[in-house]
Amino acid sequence: MGSGGDSLLGGRGSLPLLLLLIMGGMAQDSPPQILVHPQDQLFQGPGPARMSCQASGQPPPTIRWLLNGQPLSMVPPDPHHLLPDGTLLLLQPPARGHAHDGQALSTDLGVYTCEASNRLGTAVSRGARLSVAVLREDFQIQPRDMVAVVGEQFTLECGPPWGHPEPTVSWWKDGKPLALQPGRHTVSGGSLLMARAEKSDEGTYMCVATNSAGHRESRAARVSIQEPQDYTEPVELLAVRIQLENVTLLNPDPAEGPKPRPAVWLSWKVSGPAAPAQSYTALFRTQTAPGGQGAPWAEELLAGWQSAELGGLHWGQDYEFKVRPSSGRARGPDSNVLLLRLPEKVPSAPPQEVTLKPGNGTVFVSWVPPPAENHNGIIRGYQVWSLGNTSLPPANWTVVGEQTQLEIATHMPGSYCVQVAAVTGAGAGEPSRPVCLLLEQAMERATQEPSEHGPWTLEQLRATLKRPEVIATCGVALWLLLLGTAVCIHRRRRARVHLGPGLYRYTSEDAILKHRMDHSDSQWLADTWRSTSGSRDLSSSSSLSSRLGADARDPLDCRRSLLSWDSRSPGVPLLPDTSTFYGSLIAELPSSTPARPSPQVPAVRRLPPQLAQLSSPCSSSDSLCSRRGLSSPRLSLAPAEAWKAKKKQELQHANSSPLLRGSHSLELRACELGNRGSKNLSQSPGAVPQALVAWRALGPKLLSSSNELVTRHLPPAPLFPHETPPTQSQQTQPPVAPQAPSSILLPAAPIPILSPCSPPSPQASSLSGPSPASSRLSSSSLSSLGEDQDSVLTPEEVALCLELSEGEETPRNSVSPMPRAPSPPTTYGYISVPTASEFTDMGRTGGGVGPKGGVLLCPPRPCLTPTPSEGSLANGWGSASEDNAASARASLVSSSDGSFLADAHFARALAVAVDSFGFGLEPREADCVFIDASSPPSPRDEIFLTPNLSLPLWEWRPDWLEDMEVSHTQRLGRGMPPWPPDSQISSQRSQLHCRMPKAGASPVDYS
């Protein structure tokens, strides 16, 4: 019982102990840790190479070696062997090679790593590089023979061969190592530098290169040290003659590698003095094309006395060689020149930067030529190979010349790989590495790259917009667009303010006088006449003067005003001009005979208050519109006073003209016809106190065949007694309503009558016109003989002047000064057709008598060039309205040549012919015509003009003032009348008046 219990207790006590032992053992385990890392090693000697690696851990870790990340198999015939302590043995290391051995060039055998692992983890050591020692056979630079002078510095060059590790250079002299003396000997980069040459430095020198792979010895170089000599006699060196006998190409040395450079052997012969040159130098250069500039000579010191080797040349070049002797600083003459052409070799380097770019069904191949030192001749072209694959066969192309690109057509998608090689005369060189390009179908590329299409297009657009030509094109287009816009705006604005068709004139009187001298291109009737309704003018709120010569449809009526009533401004405005000379005059006949007005008592009327506001022609600020006030001088003032009133202190050509005075025959005829017309006017509901007498004047007929001043006399008129006609109240005058629209230009003020008329009669007044001779005294412009603006026509008088009823009679004056019975004439515009009974009176009164004296009735003045609207008044009332049939008759008359229609006799004869064709109509418009405002009277008017003096007519030319003054001075000095009678003109006028119309024709008034 007791023994059994002890065994049980003993069994129970061993279990915890076992657990403690197990836990203690587990507590001693640890992960592996590398204690000794492998080191870089170099094979030295024939024995195996060792690489050590030690690691710690519990349990002990397992060691494994890896080469370049790959585990080693350690199975024969693998040269690697693992020792139990983890050391790696390389049993067969690579042999130490030579320069031509390709294996010797690969000195790096790889990177070895050690890996230790157990159940707790793995540890990896650092990498160790294993390499082999290599030393090539050839020296990069061999030492050369040379001659040195005592006390001078010289250098022995040596370039050791390539090796691993880098070889060290040592110099040997005469088979023994050279003891380097500090300050005298210096080794730099393998070359030996001697600061001061001594005579003991002569000997044979050799360069030795040494590393772990062994050592290499260079060729022996002989150094000669000479004493310094006095070169006072350089004649000896100049006498040396060198003959270059031969230049031979040496075979390439295989020890120099697969790409050796050419070398030549030079042989020469020296002749001359016994003392030879101390050294010889080879001079060489490449041969240039004929006519080209030669390349510079390259110099190379030769290591021989009569022959030497020369390197540093290039294959495929033509060289020129020569030798030059030298002794210290002195140089002798050069030898002869020999030529040598080196053969070409294949290029030693492939083309560089080969690229492939896809195109539209093509592939663009481009490259860069190989470096110049690797051409080995002249590159004559390139060879391009396309490597074949499963879908594309191989192909090749030859590119001739210096072209460095090729376009290859692609027929199907796939992978394209190309190689390029340079070609010389020796053949194609080394090809480049293959460059591949994968071409996919358009649908596949679109499905694979849907998101790249948009950004690529945007980027391409940005690049295109940044190009200079695109920016310049956009700038030019924008500039042209702005220019076109500006031109359109300018044309639209100009279309609103442009002047109407027709001729235009300056308001300067000098320009007018010069313009009147040439009328070869002027038409008798202007094509710019406008027809303005008289009722519209009268009902408008604007002043009458602002309506003169303006078209209601013209928005710029102020600018197109046809009259300027103030003094001429320095700036000459441009106004329309029709180059016609037809004017008219309106005179108001009082019912009673007024006394002749004097300068102290002016016989004028004041402007009514309701018309005072309309005295300004227009409210525009335009300079021309602001000067349209009536400024015609009053006839009641003396010429001198009127001259001062107009501020004319001196006589000028442009603003001075003689005051023409009418004859008594004209005054008598006007009063007589005025008495006739009052009978017709008295038939209206109200009594007419005053009547308007209209004088119509045809413009002067210019003689194109002569530029001389031609004078024409006024017809004579007998004296008549001054009687006072009865007066009537102005308030009883009835207004006459307009019957037809008219384009008549209205004056701004009535013209007072300055001469008395015949005794009163029932015919108080009438509208009458002067004879053809007197009608030439004025031009067809609008004016008023009142100077101020207070003498204006009342609306009733204007309406009476503009339009008369169809039943009214408008008698015309005749050339004859004798009165005749009133008869209803027929008018054609400005042409008056009398009755048949009046033709007999004209035959009896065709002749004229000399002037007996007279009083100034309404003297016409030299006036401005007529305007289009004034020409309408002078050329026909029938053109006033479009619905008037008489306008067709006036148009027929006005379409004729103005050179003969200026004659009133011919015009009247033409009117008879027109009426005989059936165009005769009753007149519907008042024959009221006006004359233009003339310049103020000159103070000289009082000198040579008298009431009894009748002035002739003249035609204008620039020197008219001088001729007039000379003619008047001569004739007045002799006591003769200033203007002799013109019998020829009177006879012609009489003959014209005696003509009778044909039977059936309408009677014509030749007055």
Curated annotation (Swiss-Prot):
Consequence of substituting residue 280 to S: In AOVD3; uncertain significance
Acyltransferase is among the record's keywords: no
Outcome when changing residue 411 to Q: In AOVD3; uncertain significance
Keyword Disulfide bond: yes
Keywords, comma-separated and alphabetical: Angiogenesis, Developmental protein, Differentiation, Disease variant, Disulfide bond, Glycoprotein, Immunoglobulin domain, Phosphoprotein, Receptor, Repeat, Signal
Residue ranges constituting the Ig-like C2-type domain according to the UniProt record: 32-131, 137-224
Disulfide bond positions: 53-114, 158-207
Record's signal peptide: 1-27
Domain Fibronectin type-III: 248-345, 347-442
Extent of Low complexity compositional bias: 531-548, 725-756, 763-785
GO CC entries: axon; external side of plasma membrane; extracellular exosome; membrane; plasma membrane
Tissue specificity comment: Specifically expressed in endothelial cells. Expressed in endothelial and intimal cells of the ascending aorta.
Phosphoserine modified-residue sites: 805, 938
GO molecular function: cell-cell adhesion mediator activity; signaling receptor activity
Pfam families assigned: fn3, I-set, Ig_3
Gene3D superfamilies reported in the protein's UniProt record: Immunoglobulins (2.60.40.10)
Role: Receptor for Slit proteins, at least for SLIT2, and seems to be involved in angiogenesis and vascular patterning. May mediate the inhibition of primary endothelial cell migration by Slit proteins. Involved in the maintenance of endothelial barrier organization and function.
Protein's name according to its UniProt entry: Roundabout homolog 4
UniProt source species: Homo sapiens
